[in-house]
Amino acid sequence: MGQKRKDLSHAELMMMTIADIIKQLIEAHEQGKDVNLNKLKTKTSAKYGLSAQPRLVDIIAAVPPQHRKALVPKLKAKPIRTASGIAVVAVMCKPHRCPHINFTGNICVYCPGGPDSDFEYSTQSYTGYEPTSMRAIRARYDPYLQTRHRVEQLKQLGHSVDKVEFIVMGGTFMALPEDYRDYFIRNLHDALSGHTSNNVAEAVKYSERSLTKCVGITIETRPDYCLKRHLSDMLSYGCTRLEIGVQSVYEDVARDTNRGHTVKAVCESFHLAKDAGFKVVAHMMPDLPNMGLERDTDQFVEFFENPAFRPDGMKLYPTLVIRGTGLYELWKTGRYKSYPPSTLVDLVARILALVPPWTRVYRVQRDIPMPLVSSGVEHGNLRELALARMKDLGTQCRDVRTREVGIQEIHHKVRPYQIELIRRDYVANGGWETFLSYEDPEQDILVGLLRLRKCSEESFRPELKGGVSIVRELHVYGSVVPVSSRDPSKFQHQGFGMLLMEEAERIAKEEHGSWKIAVISGVGTRNYYRKIGYELEGPYMVKRLQ
């Protein structure tokens, strides 16, 4: 056999290896054994004398159809990617100058990227070396190609790409000219539905009926590009979540880092956005110039307890010093110094302990490759280190993401046992917020959540005037289940969403005294609400409460 093996080409050996791996996987599955895939790949590759291991994509592609259902979920690369039930596709708009250069004369001191920087082909606030930027540059910033490529890539890795959420990155999208924005959003919807549209409204109409559903679009923006006209535009795009760059709650820090807007603007934009039904995710930067540990901790206490802020989600980006920025000059001349790594882990651990149970921490650091960073975060796994530090301190992180059923299952192999409805009320941004969730309180696992808001009097959308409650988010966690099928072991489509909606309608009618309830719904999920008696009014799905 050894002689024969030498005559075979590399490709043939590779095929034999893959076939052998799949055979062993099927046997293990039939015997109900757990397999260490990496060990299996190494062993089998060595057996056939290969220097390189077969790629996961090739193994997944070669699984015979009758075994796909059993094997592909086990082979899935990076299960966290769809653990929350949705495949996230990040796309970037073309590089453009930062909008506030016109009136502050310069960009923020810590900001890399943009058309004038060392990294000239990158968008504002990105270096062009992050995975998303590289994909965007490869597609020449074409939204259609970025979407198609990423969806295909996730499919090859064994994920179910049935529900897609877009994140529009690359500086302030809303500062771009209107015709470019329309072209961009139109192409995102068209890439999923396969239709070629002439305008956004048409694209949205076809996207509603697409097989791959767009369940939401997230747009990154600044508080000064989050005014009424911007919010109305974003509603027409099918956008459901905003990421607003706050960075700091201190007026002097916002001024000295050259943000070009005040903290008051932040509070106002939060208020307007929540009254239009958006979910608000704030970007926060600890470790900015003239802060210090005390002020940094205090600002997060303020951020979560002051009703003028209280976001629905947060991305935590510890400050990085990157060449070509104003901060780099301060750092080189010794006028700015980053926290030592252990202090930073301490700070992040403290911040995570402050996060209320209705807030989701999406990220704990930027996706910037280490060689570009002159000073700042030294570890790639800051969240893990912070969670380990919290264990030592005896505190725990109770944000939405840590308690999600899908993520708990991947990390701790824990499944919920006794699920009950839990309700939390709080006041934020001039409105009454109710956070409803189905949880297993014993093990602290979250299965589904709903955010309900009694709109304040100042709501500017005509659909939401005069005693209307709005559901800003409905999400049942757990692995993606295609929209039409039911899998009894997974938590989507088990009716939790329906139960949450019924409770929300009851609260809106009996406690808020509202005559109508509205839902800000992703374009692809509108049919779900149609089934339970809602109809489209403007960008919202609404229902009269008798």
From Swiss-Prot:
Q: Which domain of life is it from?
A: Eukaryota
Organism field: Gallus gallus
Protein name stated in the entry: Elongator complex protein 3
- A GO term, aspect molecular function: metal ion binding
Pathway involvement?
Answer: tRNA modification; 5-methoxycarbonylmethyl-2-thiouridine-tRNA biosynthesis
Task: Identify the EC number(s).
Answer: 2.3.1.311
Could you state one GO biological process linked to this protein? Answer: tRNA wobble uridine modification
Q: How is the cofactor bound?
A: Binds 1 [4Fe-4S] cluster. The cluster is coordinated with 3 cysteines and an exchangeable S-adenosyl-L-methionine.
Q: Where does acetyl-CoA bind?
A: K163, E473, L474, H475, V476, F496, G497, M498, Y529
- Radical SAM core domain residues are 81-371
User: Binding positions for [4Fe-4S] cluster?
Assistant: C98, C108, C111
Assembly, per entry: Component of the elongator complex.
Keywords in alphabetical order, please: 4Fe-4S, Acyltransferase, Cytoplasm, Iron, Iron-sulfur, Metal-binding, Nucleus, RNA-binding, S-adenosyl-L-methionine, Transferase, tRNA processing, tRNA-binding
List GO terms (cellular component aspect).
cytoplasm; elongator holoenzyme complex; nucleus
Q: What are the residue boundaries of the N-acetyltransferase domain, all occurrences included?
A: 395-546
The cross-references to PROSITE patterns, in alphabetical order and at most eight, read: GNAT, RADICAL_SAM
Coiled coil spans: none
